[in-house]
Amino acid sequence: MTQILIVEDEQNLARFLELELTHENYNVDTEYDGQDGLDKALSHYYDLIILDLMLPSINGLEICRKIRQQQSTPIIIITAKSDTYDKVAGLDYGADDYIVKPFDIEELLARIRAILRRQPQKDIIDVNGITIDKNAFKVTVNGAEIELTKTEYDLLYLLAENKNHVMQREQILNHVWGYNSEVETNVVDVYIRYLRNKLKPYDRDKMIETVRGVGYVIR
């Protein structure tokens, strides 16, 4: 499931956006403080970030700049600042789109869909000596194929695709088992153990790190 982070200090608007995006089957995290939003953006995986400019602790432009130094996650700025100078600054700092408040929610949703459509799909991933071929549904280490179940494969692909981004258990559950799945989050831990056991003969089991109280990451 697509992961979206909202960084917006106006709580009524933030809750409204969270409700609308959840209704569209996006998985949403919300932060009301600039520094908290930046920390979340840099420590977790997101497909898209919705970012206000006027925030406590650190402003949106600085957040945008710091994110761009480390990753290419799409960013949509939403703000009451309508001057051309502010729009140019936002885009120059790395935002992918700029929407002036007040805005129509349908327009925002359409812009989100447009940005997500433009994101490249990765068919082959090489990480820590492991090659994952999405089209062939195949995982190899130095030419030797590792036999994985579909769930194990999907789990490994998700972590590898988001290398260096900590994936929360709930995020993993939504991506691999589906948003409407009734399984508990501890099933993620069980399948991580299965996956590590299958990677161990190739000395790759330790590449999946546990982030205590949060989830998992491949470094």
Curated annotation (Swiss-Prot):
Transmembrane segments: none annotated. Phosphorylated by ArlS. PANTHER family: REGULATOR OF RPOS (PTHR48111:SF22). Its main location: cytoplasm. It is found in: Cytoplasm. GO terms for biological process: regulation of DNA-templated transcription. The lineage of its organism: Bacteria, Bacillati, Bacillota, Bacilli, Bacillales. Member of the two-component regulatory system ArlS/ArlR involved in the regulation of adhesion, autolysis, multidrug resistance and virulence. ArlS/ArlR affects expression of the multidrug resistance transporter NorA and interacts with both Agr (virulence accessory gene regulator) (negatively) and SarA (staphylococcal accessory regulator) (positively) to modulate several virulence factor genes, including ssp (serine protease), spa (surface protein A) and hla (alpha-hemolysin). Could inhibit biofilm development by a mechanism independent of the presence of the poly-N-acetylglucosamine (PNAG). Disulfide bonds: none annotated. Keywords: Activator, Cytoplasm, DNA-binding, Phosphoprotein, Repressor, Transcription, Transcription regulation, Two-component regulatory system, Virulence. The modification 4-aspartylphosphate is found at residue 52. Coiled coil: none annotated. Residues 122-219 bind DNA. Induction: Activated by Agr, SarA, SarV and MgrA. It holds the Pfam family Response_reg. Residues 3-116 form the Response regulatory domain. The keyword Cytoplasm applies. One of its GO terms (cellular component) is protein-DNA complex. GO terms for molecular function: phosphorelay response regulator activity; transcription cis-regulatory region binding. This is Response regulator ArlR. It comes from the Bacteria.
